[in-house]
Amino acid sequence: MNSDLLTKPVMEAFRAYTAGVRWVWLDLDDTLIDFRANSIAALYATYSCCQLDRYFDSCDEWVDSYLRHNHALWDLYNRAEITQAYLRMHRFLDPVREKCPGISEESFTDEANRLDKVYLDLLAQQKCMVDGAVELVKHLRAHSYNIGVLSNGFTDVQHRKLHAVGLDKLVDAVVLSDDIGVNKPDPRIYRHAMERSGDTDPARHIMIGDNPSTDIAGALASGWRAVLYDPAVTQAVLTAGGLAVPSLRLLPSLFQGI
């Protein structure tokens, strides 16, 4: 452990903060799985598989445009302002229509569906993990914590991602917004997770995630403890909003078992 990143007072305060925690819930994309790296690899492969040079001058142009539109659409989706079907159509349609304004949604539906399937199939095969993620999950398992995955991702790909990296054998529960119809940070998904776990005491649950607006805000509003994984912070810090850490590798020393 690097004492410059995780001081003894923070360790002691965090252990008091998490006393009684039995369930550790982890976000999947960009917390356990390196979604950005995997997504970019899948997008490059999609460009070749689907001959997207029909629309874009280069693969980099396609990837940059997709990422920009997808990010904006996910913000809307997380706020329940658009449907999943709209997101999955427009993250492909909008980049293409930016290059070819005459393309209509109706004429592009079949192409968007094909792109969606190809991209998600390729994405599910990628295996890049966030540094320290596997070690954290194995540590939690060895120290008798129950482990859950709580994700806003799509059912038809999240389980395949877990299987591809071998995490499906290490977690006790997987709760997906897609399955219950509400996204983080809606408290109902956290309530559902507690009911699924069989332990409805919020103080016995903690959320580890990379998104303060969804993972952390929802957990805190539901009475859970929370850990924000944020590589931009310079050292671990514990506030009223939970713990923030720059690396998952700091967490095993904080979770010492039940």
Q: What do these predicted regions represent?
A:
Residues L43, V63-Y66, M89, Y190, ...:
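A general structural signal for well-ordered alpha-helical segments in protein cores
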Residues Q51-Y55, E98-S107, G166-L170, G198-D199:
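Short helix-capping segments at alpha-helix termini
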Residues D4-R68:
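Active-site neighborhood of HAD-like aspartate-dependent phosphohydrolases
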Residues M1-V24, A37, V134, K138-R141, ...:
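Asp-based, Mg2+/Mn2+-dependent phosphohydrolase catalytic module
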